[in-house]
Amino acid sequence: RPTWDVNPTRSIDDFKLAFYTDPGDALMRFACMPQFQSDAFFKQRDKLELAMSLPNPVDKFKRIEPRWEPNPDFTYFVHADLAQKHDKCAVAISHVEKWVEMKTFNDYTQVVPMVVTDMVAWWEPKVEGPVDLSEVKNWIIALRRKGLHLGMVTFDRWNSFDIQNELKSVGIKTDTLSVGKKHYEDMAMLIYEDRLIMPHIDVLLDEMLELKIVSDKKVDHPRKKSKDLSDAVCG
């Protein structure tokens, strides 16, 4: 039974903020309507699938489709989740499409971004050897030649010092960003509020659906699974 039935001193209005910030969790905890596996991070598969409405304009050889063109009015942001031997090395490119006014609780309004993840590219280690990070670096540099105005390229901490310096040497701004639970919570908010559009990639969807809440500060993948593409998009 819902909390407001069991406890007459509470009403559904008392939980407006909870339903606004995390509808799936609020349905389970306060309305006794579980929609999902309780330790899953993304609790609404339909919202994830709805957000993945774009084709990914990158083929298996990491070539960007000629028909995809950057918008000169947009600034593009890149995040790379580096890996060489055991995981995929993934790079995602995103931009803010526009800013919109959105009603929040108590009739307040807030100006918030509509975000588009334009593409995701990834490299996998092979029997012959690990991922060549210089190939990843050159792919990022080629984005500028493609016409993208790059605002920032961020990397997780693993093995990114050299590649950051090499990109800086050709005039590309870089920084370090270790994706954590806070970043995933921000992305979940975008998804639940229909403010994120991204490519439909089966690997990415599977990764995001398998993410688990491990602790107050950590979101992680199950054993023998991965979250490489997911981390790239989240960053």
Residue ranges and their predicted role:
Residues 1-3, 74-77, 88-90, 150-153, ...:
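Beta-sheet entry/capping signal
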Residues 71-98:
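Gly/Thr-rich phosphate-binding beta-strand-loop-beta motif of the actin/hexokinase/Hsp70
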Residues 147-159, 164:
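Short glycine-rich phosphate-binding loop at a beta-alpha junction
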Residues 81-85, 96, 155-160, 172, ...:
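An acidic- and aromatic-residue-enriched active-site/binding cleft used to recognize and process polar
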Residues 87, 128-137, 225-231:
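Phosphate/oxyanion-binding active-site loops and adjacent basic polyanion-contact surfaces
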Residues 66-67, 93-152:
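Nucleic-acid-processing active sites and adjacent nucleic-acid-binding tracks
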Residues 29, 33, 37, 161-235:
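C-terminal nuclease/phosphodiesterase catalytic domains that cleave nucleic-acid phosphodiester bonds
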